[in-house]
């Protein structure tokens, strides 16, 4: 037995800090002493007792990330856990729709079972494919949902991104929702900018949460209508400012802090960084509640410093900067846990998750755009305008003459999406504003179907990048002046790898090589959302440009 003596317990049940002592036996909390009776209790215990005097340090439950896509870290779960445990996260709720779009059910089962210490819970992907406006590698049907929904650690139906299908009562979409209801499971939402009658209609079908709010009015309306509000602060989307709504309401129980997507280079200490940012709006205790008791109440977990609960907690030296003294995971100190994980042999990756880039090699001519590079025509052209720290894009309109000038200045880039699952030969072609100042980038990580996305203005560099990407089995490529500048192989589904240390080193080298190429801090993650048609306003898939959930022509 280990007794943590003289600690300040962060009581997430009451929002207090309470002086006390906590005893741990194996992986459980055996008792919590709030009456300073620890010495008397120890005397009665016949077994060996190790006493650790924390000298007033804070004891908090470990954290829950209630909405994250592990694939965005580019690590398989057994590598991902080595990073997030160091951040005090012991439970994650994932929606593995990235790998599901590539490998279907087999991909979901791999994500569910690969981690060894981290508790991984799954919300089953509801929208695979996300829409019929792109080509996916797999489909998850209502029948598939019913096959999987009663598995251990499956909590319900993942973010229902195709909200128009819900509002318009699409039969297949409603079947999936009904399966979740049938088994009393949770249903996560995803409804950017939805309000009023449409939001009510969406909620009426059983949607319980949302993480897509972009302004305070939107967040407040969703919260007031009964949705659990997930406020995300990740690598691509940074919405922590929405906590400003806490000045207008009196009850924060239905607010959670989540990450959604975190790149590996931001993964170390990511949840601690979220908490630090949150204290600009709420107290440290309230912030901790938003990553412990609040998500626990939604997902049905039992957390908190309580007898019988899992002995997983973070020991803080202070709450001003959330400086960590140590972390205990299931009764063991973090270093011991990490040593065990590092000694474990790697599991074999299922064959279906490997060698997933099935398109033919491309030539320079594949990266010419009709009406601009050949068979020129006058007119007005749609251009995607990306927004920093947001998944939302805007539509800009330029004349053909303006486009030519801006292309020459690299103020506008060409953007392509190459279908990679079924060798259809599809290439979506478009233009994007003010993203890449030099070189060409190509990636097989592109939401949600994860076709290959490429951006640049030099056809030779674009072809080189896309072909090299096929050779390495997927990942990230940067090319310039006819040479591959740097690359990161991600052979698992073309979106993940199985060596965290190597990937961390390689991605840092990649970003160092392309420094100054883009004004976007994380261009590969940012460009991965340019192909996500369920997010407004103008996106691109392998089938072409998408606006308002409809395919539109490049020329107006």
Swiss-Prot record:
InterPro entries: Adenine_deam, Adenine_deam_C, Amidohydro-rel, Metal-dep_hydrolase_composite, Metal_Hydrolase. Its EC number is 3.5.4.2. The keyword Manganese applies. Its cofactor is Mn(2+). Gene3D superfamilies: Metal-dependent hydrolases, Urease, subunit C, domain 1. Keywords: Hydrolase, Manganese. It catalyses: adenine + H2O + H(+) = hypoxanthine + NH4(+). GO terms for biological process: adenine catabolic process. One of its GO terms (molecular function) is adenine deaminase activity. Belongs to the metallo-dependent hydrolases superfamily. Adenine deaminase family. NCBIfam families: ade. This is Adenine deaminase.
